[in-house]
A protein has these predicted regions:
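ABC ATPase NBD coupling module
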Residues: 62-76, 81, 86-87
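Catalytic Walker B motif of ABC-type/P-loop ATPase nucleotide-binding domains
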Residues: 147-151
Length: 232
């Protein structure tokens, strides 16, 4: 099977080792590791932020040479910060950069994330959890081939955590590839693959079942009947 994403020798200044990785359409991958291990740096390198090295291809197309409109079709990047500097409405944030022909997509994401009641409010007036839903809707609205999401489940209540996983799974089923940074081990089984990171390197890559013991060792915890617990 041809990979949707091919990343070759990606780096980000001194924070990320030289990495190669591939991902296929329909996959949901979680980057997991302790604070400072390189999850955000890897996402930023794949999103081609300033200072990123190496090459990234999506469906064989080099992302660095794609025009801005094409880049939006190929990938979306949700940074960890939920701050938005623009005093514009929720609907306008979601629709930013789209054409009038995309009205149906915008309305569908507003409905998916239950934002109709706040659609005309400035995004800065919303709670952190509401802003997270708005920015997730914005990331997903163009139905990009690759979704790169930094802690998308942070600040969400239990319902919206599970609903967001459901929406990401639907995006993957429709042909996108999804890579997220994840801290909460309670949700690792929702993902097809885990990439365990430490010191700017991927130290293991496999299914949640395959990496259960390594995951526990990485954090000093172990799986029990009631979930994860401290290793004694």
């Amino acid at each position: 099977m041809t990979a949707l994403l091919d990343a070759l020798a990606v780096t980000l200044e001194s924070r990320l080792a030289c990495l190669d990785l591939a991902e296929h359409a329909g996959e949901m991958v979680a980057l997991v590791g302790p604070n400072g291990c390189g999850k955000t740096s890897l996402l930023r390198a794949l999103a081609r932020v300033e200072g990123a090295g190496g090459e990234v291809f999506i469906d064989g197309e080099p992302i660095d040479r794609a025009p801005e409109a094409r880049r939006r079709q190929l990938l979306a990047f949700l940074p960890a910060s939920r701050d938005v500097p623009w005093p514009i409405s929720v609907r306008d944030i979601i629709a930013l950069g789209l054409s009038g022909r995309d009205h149906g997509r915008v309305e569908r994401r507003i409905a998916d994330f239950d934002l109709d009641d706040v659609r005309d409010r400035p995004i800065g007036s919303l709670s952190t959890g509401e802003r997270s839903r708005v920015l997730l809707a914005r990331a997903m609205v163009a139905e990009p081939r690759l979704l790169l999401l930094d802690e998308p489940l942070a600040n969400l209540d239990p319902y919206w955590t599970l609903r967001t996983i459901e929406l990401l799974r639907a995006a993957a089923a429709a042909g996108s590839a999804v890579i997220i940074a994840l801290h909460d081990l309670a949700h690792v089984d929702a993902f097809d693959r885990l990439m365990l990171m430490r010191g700017g390197k991927v130290i293991a890559d496999g299914t949640p079942g395959q990496l259960r013991d390594q995951l526990g060792a990485l954090f000093g915890v172990e799986a029990g009947d009631g979930g994860w617990r401290l290793r004694r």
